[in-house]
Design a protein with these regions (language model features):
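Amphipathic alpha-helical "coupling" segments that flank catalytic cores
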Residues: 1-4, 21, 28-757
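Intrinsically disordered, low-complexity proline-rich regions
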Residues: 7-10, 14, 22-27
Length: 757
C-alpha cells in the first residue's frame, strides 16, 4: 500500500453517468433519518477520536452548504475500529435552494455599442444554465455588472445525496476526513486512513445508490442490493448483512453485540472492569483512566467482552508505575487495586466472546508474566549501575538535538538557568544546593534500561533511582516533578502540579531551556505544527510559575541563557531579538491560561502586556487586579486619563525628557503639575508593593478632574515650541507614571463603549 500525506479524492461514479435512483415513495414525502456508514479495514485507535469529531462537524457544514434542513442537534457521529457512522435525524425530504444572484461580466463587456449581448455574456449564461430574461444590471462601487438571477429550486433529498452531478455531499464528506497518514489501495486513487471496504447509505428505507467507493477488491455494493449492505462479525470472518432501514441497521448491530456509540462503549467497558474488580475486593486503578488506556481500548474494540485474570504476586515488588506501564503498554489490560495497593489481578477486554475463554486467559497470563519478568530484570540491571550520579556520567551519549548537543550539556544549562531563579526566589544555601543536585541528575534516568523500555516513565524512574542512591527526598521528588504539569489521576480535576519548591524550580528551568533552545534554532510553533511540544512547555512554565507564585524574572533568565548554545556565537542584536520573541511567546500563553474567577478578558490582558513585563508573575498579578476592578468608576477614570494623555502624545515629537515647572504658566497646568509632583511617590509605592488596585483607584481620582480641566482650558500644541514641549513632557510624565508600572488602560474596550463617567 502506498502511504502519503493527507489528500482527498472524490469517489468514482458507477458507469460515469448520472445513475437512476430506485426511489421508494413512502420515504420521499416526509422527513426521514439519513444513515451513512463508511466500512474500513481496522482503523488505528489513535485516529478514531479525531475522525469521529470531523465526521460530525464536516457533515453539519456540508448539509448547510448544500441547503439541507434539519435540527441543529440532529447530526450524530459514531465510530468503531471498522466503521464510521453518520446519522442525521429528521432530514427534510426536499432540498430547497434559495434564489441566488451571481455576478457576471461588467456591463461594458456584456453588451456591445448597439446594446446586444456579447459572446462574453452569452458564455457566462450558458455556463450557469440561464437566459437573458434572468439577468439584471446592478451598480456598485466596482461599477455596473450583469447579474444572473438563479431561481429558487427544490430537489428531492435522495436525488442529491451521493449524486456526483448534484454536488455529491457524501462523497465530499469522505474526502474531507483527514488523518495523520492516509493510503491508496486501488486504481481509483481514493485516499483514506485505511482502505474503505464498503459503504452503506440509506435515507429512511431508500438506498442512496448514486455513488460507490473506488474499490474493486471488496465489492461493498452489488447490483442486486445497492447501498444496503453492511458487514458484521469478527475481523477474520465478516459477513454481509442486508439492511432494510435505518432502524433495522441499529437492530442488526445490537444483535451482533456491536456497541456503536463510543461514549456508551467506554461506559460499558469501565462498568465491566469495575464489576470484575469488585469480585476480588478491588477497583480499577485510576491511572488506567487518566493515562488513556480506557480511551485506547474503547477505540480498539466494537464488541467488548471482559476477561479477568491474574499474575504472579512476586512482581508486586516493582514500583506501581512500572507495573502499570507494563500492563498498559504491552497487554492493554486493566490493573486492580485495593486500599491504594495493586492486586495481582487484571481485566482484559477482548473483541467478541472467545470460543475457549480459559485458553485465552492462560495465554494472556503467560505473556503478562513474561513481560513483568522482563521489567523486574530491567529494574535489577539498572540498580547494579547505581548510584544515579554514575548514570549521569553517561548522558554525553544521549542526544538532545543534533544542533544543541547532548543531555549532559543540557544538564549544564539547567544549572546555569537555576541561578537567577534561585536568586529571585531567595532560596537558602541548602535549597540552592538541592536545586543544583536536581539539575545534575534530572536527565540521568534516560540512560537506564527501564526508561528505554518505558519512555513515559522518565522522571518517575529517576525519582526511585535517586532515592535508592541515597539522594535527599527533595532531589528525588524534583526529578519526577520536572515533567509536570500532567493530567490528574482519574482524569478529573485540574492538572497535577509540582508539590515541592525545588521541583517547581526544576520544572520551570527545564521547560525554559527547551523553549529557548528551539526558538534559537528558528523552530517556532505554527498553526497546528508543534513537533517538539513547545506550546505545552510554555504553558507549563506559566502554570507552574502561577502555582508557586514566586517571581519569574524573564530578563535575568535570558541573560543566563544567551551565553550558551545556540546563542553563544549570535550577534548581540539578534540575540536580543530572540529573547524578545521567546518572552513574547510566553506572555501570549496568558490568553489561554486557566485563570481563577473572575476570568480576565482579552482586553485586560492586552492592557498589561502593552506595559513592561519582565516578571511573569507580576504581570499576571496586574491582570488579576485589573479584572477585579471591572465596572468600577475608578477604573474608567484611570483609563480615560491614560487614553487622553496617549492621544496627545501620539505622533507628537517629544524632545524634552523632563518637565520644567518654572515654564508652567497657566493655572490648570500648574495645578496638574502640583497633583503629579505631590502624589507620584504614592502611586509608585503602591505599584511597587503590588497594590495595583489601590494604585489604579488613586491614579484615577488624582488625575481625572485636573486633566479634564487642563484640556478644556490649555492648548498643548501651541506655536511656542518650548512651551509645547514642556506641556508634552507633563503629559508623558503622567502617562508613564501608570503605564510603565501597571498597564496601558487605553487598550480596554470600556473606552470604546463611550461610557459616561
Amino acid at each position: 500500500m502506498k502511504k502519503k500525506g493527507v489528500q482527498g479524492s472524490r469517489l468514482k461514479v458507477q458507469g460515469g453517468r448520472q445513475p437512476s435512483l430506485n426511489l421508494e415513495p413512502r420515504t420521499l414525502n416526509r422527513a426521514a433519518d439519513l444513515l451513512f456508514e463508511i466500512g474500513t479495514e481496522e482503523l488505528p485507535a489513535a485516529y478514531l477520536p479525531s475522525l469521529i469529531e470531523q465526521l460530525g462537524l464536516k457533515a453539519k457544514a456540508l448539509l448547510a452548504q448544500h441547503h439541507f434542513t434539519c435540527r441543529s442537534d440532529a447530526v450524530e457521529a459514531f465510530g468503531t475500529p471498522r466503521r464510521l457512522v453518520l446519522v442525521v435525524r429528521g432530514l427534510d425530504p426536499v432540498r430547497r435552494q434559495p434564489s441566488q444572484q451571481i455576478r457576471g461580466p461588467a456591463k461594458a463587456v456584456a453588451y456591445d455599442k448597439a446594446g446586444k449581448p456579447t459572446p462574453a455574456l452569452l458564455g457566462f449564461l450558458r455556463s450557469r444554465g440561464g437566459t437573458l430574461k434572468q439577468t439584471k444590471i446592478v451598480s456598485s462601487e466596482k461599477g455596473e455588472h450583469v447579474y444572473f438571477i438563479k431561481p429558487a429550486t427544490e430537489t428531492r433529498t435522495v436525488e442529491v445525496l451521493g449524486n456526483p452531478l448534484l454536488g455529491d455531499p457524501l462523497g465530499q464528506l469522505i474526502a474531507q476526513l483527514h488523518a495523520p497518514k492516509t493510503m491508496r489501495w486501488d486504481e481509483s486513487n481514493t485516499r483514506f486512513a485505511r482502505p474503505i471496504r464498503w459503504l452503506l447509505a440509506l435515507y429512511g428505507s431508500t438506498p442512496l445508490v448514486g455513488m460507490r467507493p473506488g474499490i474493486t477488491s471488496a465489492g461493498g455494493q452489488t447490483r442486486s442490493q445497492p447501498g444496503r449492505l453492511t458487514r458484521l462479525g469478527r475481523p477474520q470472518g465478516l459477513r454481509e448483512v442486508r439492511v432494510a432501514s435505518v432502524s433495522g441497521y441499529f437492530q442488526a448491530l445490537q444483535r451482533a453485540g456491536i456497541i456503536l456509540d463510543q461514549r456508551q462503549r467506554r461506559s460499558r467497558i469501565e462498568q465491566a472492569v469495575s464489576r470484575l474488580a469488585a469480585r476480588v475486593g478491588g477497583r480499577i486503578s485510576p491511572e488506567m483512566v487518566s493515562h488513556g488506556l480506557l480511551d485506547e481500548v474503547t477505540h480498539l474494540v466494537e464488541v467488548p467482552v471482559p476477561l479477568a485474570g491474574g499474575f504472579d504476586a512476586t512482581y508486586l515488588t516493582l514500583p506501581r508505575e512500572v507495573l502499570l506501564a507494563s500492563m498498559a503498554k504491552h497487554q492493554r489490560v486493566f490493573a486492580m487495586e485495593a486500599q491504594g495497593k495493586l492486586l495481582p489481578n487484571f481485566v482484559a477486554i477482548l473483541e467478541g466472546k472467545p470460543k475457549r475463554p480459559a485458553g485465552v486467559k492462560r495465554v494472556i497470563e503467560r505473556i503478562l508474566n513474561a513481560r513483568l519478568a522482563d521489567s523486574l530484570l530491567f529494574w535489577k540491571e539498572d540498580h547494579a549501575r547505581l548510584p544515579l550520579t554514575r548514570m549521569a556520567e553517561s548522558l554525553s551519549g544521549v542526544s538532545f538535538h543534533e544542533k544543541l548537543g547532548s543531555m549532559a550539556e543540557k544538564s549544564v544549562r539547567l544549572r546555569a538557568l537555576a541561578e537567577p531563579l534561585a536568586e529571585a526566589w531567595k532560596l537558602t544555601d541548602e535549597e540552592c544546593g538541592l536545586l543544583r543536585k536536581a539539575c545534575q541528575l534530572a536527565k540521568a534516568d534516560l540512560v537506564s534500561t527501564m526508561v528505554k523500555e518505558f519512555p513515559t516513565l522518565q522522571g518517575v524512574v529517576g525519582k526511585y533511582y535517586a532515592s535508592d542512591s541515597g539522594e535527599p527526598a527533595a532531589v528525588a521528588e524534583a526529578i519526577e516533578e520536572q515533567y509536570l504539569p500532567a493530567p490528574h489521576p482519574g482524569g478529573a480535576g485540574p492538572s497535577r502540579l509540582p508539590r515541592t519548591l525545588i521541583g517547581s524550580a526544576l520544572a520551570i528551568v527545564d521547560k525554559y531551556d527547551t523553549l529557548s533552545s528551539y526558538f534559537g534554532l528558528g523552530i517556532v510553533p505554527s498553526g497546528d505544527q508543534d513537533p517538539f511540544a513547545l506550546r505545552r512547555a510554555a504553558q507549563g512554565i506559566v502554570e507552574v510559575a502561577w502555582a508557586v507564585h514566586r517571581a519569574l524574572p524573564l530578563d535575568q533568565c535570558w541573560r543566563a541563557r544567551v551565553s550558551m548554545e545556540p546563542f553563544r556565537a549570535t550577534a548581540p542584536k539578534d540575540a536580543a531579538g530572540a529573547g524578545h520573541r521567546i518572552h513574547r511567546y510566553l506572555l501570549e500563553r496568558l490568553y489561554a491560561f486557566a485563570w481563577p474567577s473572575p476570568v480576565p478578558t482579552a482586553d485586560c490582558i492586552d492592557a498589561v502586556l502593552a506595559s513592561p513585563c519582565d516578571d511573569l508573575i507580576d504581570a499576571m498579578d496586574r491582570i488579576v487586579s485589573l479584572q477585579r476592578l471591572t465596572g468600577h468608576p475608578g477604573l474608567r477614570k484611570a483609563a480615560k486619563v491614560i487614553e487622553r494623555t496617549r492621544n496627545i502624545l501620539k505622533g507628537a515629537p517629544l524632545r524634552q525628557p523632563q518637565v520644567d515647572p518654572a515654564r508652567l504658566t497657566e493655572p490648570p497646568e500648574r495645578k496638574l503639575w502640583d497633583v503629579y509632583a505631590s502624589n507620584r511617590e504614592r502611586v509608585a509605592c503602591l505599584a511597587a508593593e503590588r497594590s495595583y488596585g489601590d494604585a489604579t483607584m488613586l491614579f484615577g481620582e488624582l488625575f481625572f478632574e485636573p486633566l479634564h480641566e487642563f484640556f478644556d482650558r490649555v492648548l498643548v500644541n501651541v506655536p511656542d515650541e518650548s512651551l509645547q514641549q514642556n506641556r508634552l513632557a507633563l503629559m508623558q510624565a503622567i502617562h508613564t507614571l501608570y503605564t510603565e508600572r501597571i498597564a496601558d488602560l487605553s487598550k480596554l474596550t470600556l473606552l470604546q463603549r463611550e461610557e459616561i463617567l
